[in-house]
Amino acid sequence: MRQKVTLACVQCASRNYTAAKQIRRLGERLMANKFCSTCNKHTIHRETK
């Protein structure tokens, strides 16, 4: 089963993306290199609580 999580930009903290994550991996926080429209560049996006 999967759970929806929100990804937020590390630099400006805007929440730009949603992703699905397996419930078994709840201890690990998801990180991805995505484009932030607020910063207008690719930045690291981290899973928010």
Swiss-Prot record:
InterPro entries hit by this protein: Ribosomal_bL33, Ribosomal_bL33_sf, Ribosomal_zn-bd
Keywords: Ribonucleoprotein, Ribosomal protein
GO MF term (any one): structural constituent of ribosome
Pfam families per UniProt: Ribosomal_L33
Annotated GO biological process: translation
Keyword Ribosomal protein assigned: yes
Gene3D superfamilies: Ribosomal protein L33
One GO location term (cellular component): cytoplasm
Similarity field: Belongs to the bacterial ribosomal protein bL33 family.
Name this polypeptide is given: Large ribosomal subunit protein bL33A
